[in-house]
Curated annotation (Swiss-Prot):
Its main location: plastid. This is Small ribosomal subunit protein uS8c. Belongs to the universal ribosomal protein uS8 family. Keywords: Chloroplast, Plastid, Ribonucleoprotein, Ribosomal protein, RNA-binding, rRNA-binding. It comes from the Eukaryota. The lineage of its organism: Eukaryota, Viridiplantae, Streptophyta, Embryophyta, Tracheophyta. One of its GO terms (molecular function) is rRNA binding. InterPro entries: Ribosomal_uS8, Ribosomal_uS8_CS, Ribosomal_uS8_sf. It comes from Phalaenopsis aphrodite subsp. formosana.
């Protein structure tokens, strides 16, 4: 069985958020860099830095701080997976919480959000939901 890098990112961020840890260490690949860049741009994480440890590159992400213990939990859900790929055209991309959340897609133009896909009128593989 192969590794599902996107599921590993989602699980790492979700577990760090539940345990109220400030930082998440993720293996650096092109896919993870693009997803972390989207999360940074959308405000789900505060900071990202590169880290090298024994010939392996990592991305250390700082999660957004919460003012109270209960608020602002990051919810992530993996949609398309290696055993069941889910594709959508730009007209049928779902809106999460009426547009408050984001959908991350893998398209012919790279990994982008649902808003960018609708503007460029391109569909693709739905990787995950974040709200």
């Amino acid at each position: 069985m192969g590794r599902d890098i996107i599921a590993n990112i989602i699980t790492s961020i979700r577990n760090a958020d539940i345990d109220q840890k400030g930082r998440v260490k993720i293996v650096s690949t092109n896919i993870t860099k693009n997803i972390v860049k989207i999360l940074l741009r959308e405000g789900f994480i505060e900071n990202v830095r590169k880290h090298q440890e024994s010939q392996k590159n990592f991305l250390v992400s700082t999660l957004r701080h919460r003012k109270t213990r209960k608020g602002n939990k990051i919810n992530l859900k993996r949609i398309s997976r290696p055993g069941l790929r889910i594709y959508s055209n730009y007209q049928q991309i779902p809106k999460i919480l009426g547009g408050m959340g984001i959908v991350i897609l893998s398209t012919s133009r790279g990994i982008i959000t649902d808003r960018e896909a609708r503007l460029e009128k391109i569909g693709g593989e739905i990787l995950c939901y974040i709200w």
